[in-house]
Amino acid sequence: MAKKITATNPRLVKLIEILKQESYKNQAKIWKDIARRLAKPRRRRAEVNLSKINRYTKEGDVVLVPGKVLGAGKLEHKVVVAAFAFSETAKKLIKEAGGEAITIEELIKRNPKGSNVKIMA
C-alpha cells in the first residue's frame, strides 16, 4: 500500500484548507481546483515565466498561478498576478510594468467567487 505524502509547509497546508472552505462557502469550483493543484508534489507544481503571462494576457487581466512565478522574460502591460510564490526578479518586473504581485489569500479576499481569473500552469 502506497504511503500518502502530505505537504510539510505549514503555509501551504493552511492555504489548501482555506481554498477548500472558500470553494464550499462561495460555490466557486475554481478554489477547489487550485487546492488540488497546490496539493501536488513541488516538482509537479506550476512554474510560470513572465514571458508566458505577457503572451496570454492583456491589460487589466487577473492571473492565478498555482505555484511559482519566475522572472524570465518581460511584462509589457499591467496585470494582477496572484501566486503561491514569486522570485525576486518576477516581483520587481511586475511592479515596474505597473502591475501587482499578490498572494492567493489576497485574491480570495478581493474576488471570493473567482470570476474573471485566468489560471496559468
UniProtKB/Swiss-Prot annotation:
Disulfide bonds: none annotated. Gene3D superfamilies: 3.100.10.10. SUPFAM superfamilies: Ribosomal proteins L15p and L18e (SSF52080). It holds the Pfam family Ribosomal_L18. GO terms for cellular component: cytosolic large ribosomal subunit. InterPro entries: Ribosomal_eL18 (IPR000039), Ribosomal_eL18/eL18-A/B/_CS (IPR021132), Ribosomal_eL18_arc (IPR022947), Ribosomal_uL15/eL18 (IPR021131), Ribosomal_uL15/eL18_sf (IPR036227), Ribosomal_uL15_CS (IPR001196). One of its GO terms (molecular function) is structural constituent of ribosome. GO terms for biological process: translation. Keywords: Ribonucleoprotein, Ribosomal protein. NCBIfam families: PRK04005.1. Belongs to the eukaryotic ribosomal protein eL18 family. This is Large ribosomal subunit protein eL18. The lineage of its organism: Archaea, Methanobacteriati, Methanobacteriota, Methanomada group, Methanococci.
